Structures are given as C-alpha cells and as structure tokens.
Amino acid sequence: RDRDKFFHLGDVNITLKKEGATDWQKYSSSTKRVDVKPLAHKKSLAAANMSAALGDIPLEVNRYWQNVNGDLVLKFEIKNTTQTNYEIGGLGIPMIFNNNLDWKNLDTAHMDNVFFDPYIGKDAGYLQVNRLHGNGPSLLVLPHENAGFEAYNPLNSDPTPRSITFEGFHEWVIHSKAYAETEWKGVEQWNTPTSTVLKPGESKSFAVRMVLAPNIKEIENELIRQQRPVAVGVSGYI
C-alpha cells in the first residue's frame, strides 16, 4: 500500500476554490507519494508540512500527531498564504483501518480485522472501530477541534479491489459543500453541507482524537467520560 492513490491514516482530502469562483479543485495527499517536510514542533510526536504531497495546492497544509492527555490526536492546520480568499468546501480525513477480509478464513479474520460503525452526528459524532472477535478495547474517533462528523464518504478512488468481503474505505468528512454541489448534487444530505473561507494570512486547525473504551460494552460510558452526548435505547421505547 505504499504506492500512489492508496490511502493511509494521516492522509487528507481537500476540495477548494477561490471565493466566488464556480469550479471546485480537488487535492489529495494520496494521489502521488512524495516526501513531506518534517517540522520541529515541541508539542507534537511528529509534524510535517504536507503541501508537496498535495500537488499545486495554493494553501499551506501542516499535519501534527500529538499526545493529548494520553490520547492520540491527528491535526491538520491549513493556512492561506495567498492574497485571495479561498473557500474549503470539501475536507476529509481518511479513516484507514484493517477491515479487508479478502482471502482470510474465519479464525484469521477474527484475529486480525476490525469493523467500523459511524455516527455522523456533527460535533456529537464519532466512529467506533471494533475487533471482529469482540474482545479487548474499542477505538473511538472523536471530533477534537473544528472537526464535526458531517458526512461519511466512500473512498472510491482507492485501488484496493472491492468484494463481498471488503466494502472499501471511507473518510471522515468535516466540510461537504463541494460534494453536495458536484457528485452528491440533487441528493438530500443527512447534515447541512458546510464550508470554511480562509482570508489571506488566515489559518485554521482541524483535528480528531482517538480514545480507547475498555471494551465494546463500555463505549457509551467512555463517550460520557469524554463529555459527549449519549442516547441509550431501552426495551419498550418508541
């Protein structure tokens, strides 16, 4: 998976245009694999300028992996270094985990693989990642900074073949206005599509946080500990 167009956790997809323009321009760090520029950043486990991996993108994009109170945070900082307003109408973070069951027997799949369950609830949204065998901790991906879970978009450009045992990968979509005006046009959206406008010299950070629930049954309690709203259905409710 180290070739062009294969997505990894840490990639980013950005769709933008000059404010007032008509056509959206797409950029993805998966399109062509090139070296990123490491950055010195004391508060990060690793930091890099990703602009080179995004082709001719007019904005500066930096990525930070951080430890926040024992949790892993993936943050992207986008800065407008031009003299023009730019509107970011598509912003997605690929959620790449091992959900490919191809060529595996039941025992191997249960040992190696996971399945996802997204809740696209904006700032209350989250993605849970559980092992197929159902044991051990569950991974929860949560909004951390300006990263409401607005949509869950299939990454159809990833070359990994789809099959009855592999549904493909998806991205956590923070802004979906560009999608709603192009490939999703005419389709009712679960959440109102949004965008962000960056003025010259302005920057904005977007981050998700990865936390562990002790086990699947503790997911709701972990969400409460993370100060997230939780609704639990009980027998007989309507």
Where are these regions (language model features)?
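Acidic-aromatic substrate-binding/catalytic surfaces of carbohydrate-active enzymes
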Residues: 1-51, 112, 116-117, 124-179
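Extended, loop-rich substrate-binding clefts of extracytoplasmic carbohydrate-active enzymes
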Residues: 13-75, 81-83, 87, 168-194, ...
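Extracellular beta-rich ligand/substrate-recognition surface
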Residues: 51-57, 106-108, 118-121, 131, ...
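Short, hydrophobic/aromatic beta-strand segments
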Residues: 82-92, 219-220
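Short acidic, flexible loop segments centered on an aromatic residue
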Residues: 89-100, 176-181, 224
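Short aromatic-acidic-glycine turn motif
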Residues: 96-110
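Catalytic cores of secreted or luminal carbohydrate-active enzymes
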Residues: 188-234
